[in-house]
Amino acid sequence: MRILGLDLGSKTLGVALSDEMGWTAQGIETIKIDEAGGDYGLNRLAELTKDYVIDKIVLGFPKNMNGTVGPRGEASQKFAEVLEETFQVPVVLWDERLSTMAAERMLISADVSRQKRKKVIDKMAAVMILQGYLDSLNS
């Protein structure tokens, strides 16, 4: 069983993948997307779901700090529907509050340059989202 973890932004889509046992998440890549133009990287996601035989997708679900759903959360809900229809696998919306900030702090503490952080931040956020989900299953 492999699970794909996604962190949806307006310009990029961070992608992570679980190991076959469902214990750990590894960053795969960051896909450039154009949310305004309706390009969500579905062609590349189709390749990944086929290559890795994905059973489930965990999509980061950004909520406001008070628990309400804002515009980014609504975009994630719509994207989840598209993913389910396109790939015919269950999509789990996972609370991702502060995941990007936590990934940023982790990269800063590892002394990763600002230029390098910009390239990997969404992939790292996807790892944190997926790992949180996997940990909840295995606890």
Curated annotation (Swiss-Prot):
For this chain's UniProt record, which GO biological process terms are given?
A: rRNA 5'-end processing
Q: Entry's SUPFAM superfamilies? A: Ribonuclease H-like
The cysteines covalently paired via disulfide bonds are none
Q: Give the main EC class.
A: hydrolase
Give the matching CDD domains.
YqgF (cd16964)
A cellular component term, taken from the record's GO annotations = cytosol
Keyword set, alphabetical order: Cytoplasm, Hydrolase, Nuclease, Ribosome biogenesis
Superkingdom classification of source: Bacteria
Listed InterPro entries: RNaseH-like_sf (IPR012337), YqgF (IPR005227), YqgF/RNaseH-like_dom (IPR006641), YqgF/RNaseH-like_dom_sf (IPR037027)
UniProt subcellular location = Cytoplasm
Instruction: Extract the GO molecular function terms from the UniProt entry.
Output: nuclease activity
Which first-to-last residue range defines the signal peptide? Answer: none
Q: What is its EC number?
A: 3.1.-.-
* Stated family: Belongs to the YqgF nuclease family.
| Protein function | Could be a nuclease involved in processing of the 5'-end of pre-16S rRNA.
| Protein name, entry field | Putative pre-16S rRNA nuclease
Q: Mind giving the lineage of the organism this protein is from?
A: Bacteria, Bacillati, Bacillota, Bacilli, Bacillales
